Structure formats: C-alpha cells, structure tokens
C-alpha cells in the first residue's frame, strides 16, 4: 500500500480527508 497502488491511494485518501474534515468541523461547530 506504500507503493501508491492504483485506486488505493485515491480511495483511501479521499475518505480519510473527508473524515478528517468532518471530524475537524464536528468539534469546531
């Protein structure tokens, strides 16, 4: 997974960023 697999880094980075943004907006709200 550290070799930047096709669809793996994009699928894991999208949900991870969305989760981090939601977590930062949740407590910030």
From Swiss-Prot:
Organism: Human immunodeficiency virus type 1 group M subtype U (isolate Z3)
Family, similarity comment: Belongs to the lentiviruses Tat family.
Subcellular location as annotated: Host nucleus, Host nucleolus; Host cytoplasm; Secreted
GO terms of molecular function: metal ion binding; RNA binding
Subunit architecture: Interacts with host CCNT1. Associates with the P-TEFb complex composed at least of Tat, P-TEFb (CDK9 and CCNT1), TAR RNA, RNA Pol II. Recruits the HATs CREBBP, TAF1/TFIID, EP300, PCAF and GCN5L2. Interacts with host KAT5/Tip60; this interaction targets the latter to degradation. Interacts with the host deacetylase SIRT1. Interacts with host capping enzyme RNGTT; this interaction stimulates RNGTT. Binds to host KDR, and to the host integrins ITGAV/ITGB3 and ITGA5/ITGB1. Interacts with host KPNB1/importin beta-1 without previous binding to KPNA1/importin alpha-1. Interacts with EIF2AK2.
Key word Zinc present: yes
Motif Cell attachment site: positions: 6-8
GO cellular component terms, A-Z: extracellular region; host cell cytoplasm; host cell nucleolus
Record's protein name: Protein Tat
Keyword annotations: Acetylation, Activator, AIDS, Apoptosis, Host cytoplasm, Host nucleus, Host-virus interaction, Metal-binding, Methylation, Phosphoprotein, RNA-binding, Secreted, Transcription, Transcription regulation, Ubl conjugation, Zinc
